[in-house]
């Protein structure tokens, strides 16, 4: 007998309100055929590879920390194209349009030879080697078994291009719940934190993206360069799912490492191996069989195992730098438009990680007159140097000042319209205002307590390597290495129209092949 039954499945209805659609910049930004080449000076930095060196008489930094494992974040300042004195005034209408820059190509130049740098700690928390032990090593009676250990970090090459700072992630100490009431010495809860990657932030060298300063109180579990730092890693998942995609137009990454040594930590184990799972009458737990009382294994060793990583071979065959990259389509909705006339370039490269060893005789004695070598007669110093050069291909673009476009930009970032001086200016209620000459003197009234403030830099509290390119632009692309590469790969040729150099497609003609007569 057939019986009708109501559908038991759930019915999903569309949202009552329409979902706002974010447009791509290609839908409202009009690109021109005018291109500029921008380049920086040779950017150099020198410092100590492990820590800041302070003046003994004050807290002033004498030698800054410059490590090959740090992030270098360049903030490139571009000129305002709306203030350009263009020879061809038909390029855009300032009453109906605004000009912006679009990044079409970039080359990050790196100087200095390839080299492997070592990191370490003179008091490294390493009790023994657990890779190939020949005898069972019990926990010694000594209260301090730290060793002087060094190793090479994980090999890392990476750069990220965007018009906003790169978003990073790291694990940090979290606040426990009030109802938990953990006892002293308990492992604290940890949480994932997102923050902008700034210049000088340490990258992951093989021990994870962690706040080591807050979560490793023994100050001996990692190397000196990160023991008092926070290692950050770019949050690619969040940047790829960003609505606008300003933090990352595109990126290139190459990581490489392998476990070279296997050690065990010293100290008391916080999480003991579970021994409560007792079998029926066998007195055996689920993880090991208890040893005899007269054996060395009776006092079970530490189970805090960890490897020391190695970046292995450094080769010029796998370099991301000193080569051009062209941007045709960005991963987000922002297809390379440099809002606020700025570009952020986040770089990590520890394939040029050589640390210079400099030895100095404190007595300033002539080397030829030193008879015998004594180690205490020389002072050893470490220095690390880095060399960069940035080149860009910028395309001039137009943004029409229509209601739809302005609404889209206002929803994205209203400060862009303020910078374009498109804010609503009310009519003055009184054309005549009072202006005092000696407003700061005691004879006149107090000045206004709330004077109008200029728009503050949203990144003023962040640390970046500022590079001014406002006077480093050129229309002569064929006079520069990156410009010639761009003209060749795009199949373009440079022409001059009304005093403005533009690019047009190169058309090649072939002669008619005649048939050979017999």
Swiss-Prot record:
It is found in: Virion; Host nucleus. InterPro entries: Capsid_L1_Papillomavir (IPR002210), Capsid_L1_sf_Papillomavir (IPR036973), dsDNA_vir_gr_I_capsid (IPR011222). Pfam families: Late_protein_L1. Keywords: Capsid protein, Disulfide bond, Host nucleus, Host-virus interaction, Late protein, T=7 icosahedral capsid protein, Viral attachment to host cell, Viral penetration into host cytoplasm, Virion, Virus endocytosis by host, Virus entry into host cell. GO terms for biological process: endocytosis involved in viral entry into host cell; virion attachment to host cell. Residues 131-142 have a biased composition (Polar residues). One of its GO terms (molecular function) is structural molecule activity. Residues 127-149 are annotated as: Disordered. It comes from the Viruses. One of its GO terms (cellular component) is T=7 icosahedral viral capsid. Its main location: virion. Forms an icosahedral capsid with a T=7 symmetry and a 50 nm diameter. The capsid is composed of 72 pentamers linked to each other by disulfide bonds and associated with L2 proteins. Binds to heparan sulfate proteoglycans on cell surface of basal layer keratinocytes to provide initial virion attachment. This binding mediates a conformational change in the virus capsid that facilitates efficient infection. The virion enters the host cell via endocytosis. During virus trafficking, L1 protein dissociates from the viral DNA and the genomic DNA is released to the host nucleus. Self-assembles into homopentamers. The capsid has an icosahedral symmetry and consists of 72 capsomers, with each capsomer being a pentamer of L1. Interacts with the minor capsid protein L2; this interaction is necessary for viral genome encapsidation. Interacts with protein E2; this interaction enhances E2-dependent replication and transcription activation. Belongs to the papillomaviridae L1 protein family. This is Major capsid protein L1. It comes from Human papillomavirus 21. The lineage of its organism: Viruses, Monodnaviria, Shotokuvirae, Cossaviricota, Papovaviricetes.
